[in-house]
Amino acid sequence: KGGNEAAEIGKLISNAIIRRHLETMQRLGIEYDFLPQESEILHLHFWDLAFEQLKQKGVLYFETEGKNKGCWVMKRAGNKASSSQTAKVVSPAPDGKATEAAAEGPDEDAKVIVRSNNTVTYVGKDIAYHLWKFGLLGRDFGYQRFYRYPDSRQVWISAESGEADHPHFGGVHASYTVIDSRQEDPQNNVIEALRGLGYTEQAENHHHFSYAFVVLTPRCAEELGYKLSAEDKERPFIEISGRKGFGVKADDLIDALIAAAQKEVDSRHAEMQESERREIAAQIAIGALRYFMLKFTKSSVIAFDFKEALSFEGETGPYAQYAIVRATNIFRKAGLSAEEILAGETDLRFLQEDDELWELWLSAGQLSSMVEQCIATTEPAYAAKYAFQLAQQFNNFYHKHHILTETDEARKHFLLATAAVVRRALIEGLALMGIDAPPVM
């Protein structure tokens, strides 16, 4: 409950961890606006308000027998009870108020929301939190400044009492909860609670952005310093387990990726300043990591591998980045900018020369459709696939057409415009995934 030395020490440690988390995520180009703390859901009585709603609407009932005796429970999401099980009788709750319980005896599969010792489960607090998210609770957090980014943008954190002047959070139209597939049942319970309370629209607009696990290839595990048994070396992947002490610190992974990328950059661009080479290596490394994590569908287990992620060939971030660098080099050698070419008049009759040219322009123009597909399916893998396929098409175009030595000026302008259109689509497509385009590679 706070107010003692142990609580103060705990707060000091947790705040230090949160700040380090923010710094690590910042390296990946990931930023936050607001950090809600679970403790405030109880301290600010969010749960008390949610509990009253849940009881009044009959979403929760008090169990008087069976393994859940003395608990407040709700029907587990997806559990289709028989007609005999759904018959209800009124049972007294500890507070003297009437509540309903199953007439045919206890539902042993019901989801416990409040334990018999009156402690609230994770799902219970999550229900209250989502009522706040949708502006259905009638109460708000206090807000305090917590962390400032280099551009002066502020991260806020919840508090029991906060600053009077703060941004507005909550009251959303749709909610996306990014949490792994093991939380499917708890998230379904949140949705069923919203529906049971009569908030049908909000239940439909609460999305569990589920994803599978990230593991390591044996080669990657060894590169990170782990000693593997002969048996482990033959396995397709090595699972990460915090409880077993087998894991990867995000900063260590990022550092290792940057170091590997910098070896390539140093060997190719020794004439550049070290700070420039370091920045380019970071862009390649972060791009490689983000692309690798996004190219798999959400239901796929991701077996991370350094060599595969940093490869300049195949479906990787560096492959897509290199296509942009290749296009940029064309304009540098031509003494023109891509923007100048796009501002000029382009004779599109040259599209009739080759089906591949038409397909390349068509693909470059499908960026918006790809974005809509990602949103509709909540599947970012489509963005990664789009970038790879467009880069692949552009590389085929690059090797087939001698752009800079083309003698027909109208056709040369058309070929330059083709490169400019594709370059723009690739830059925007990678930017949607949080990936920068380095000036050289």
Language model regions located:
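Non-catalytic interaction-recognition regions
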Residues: 1-441
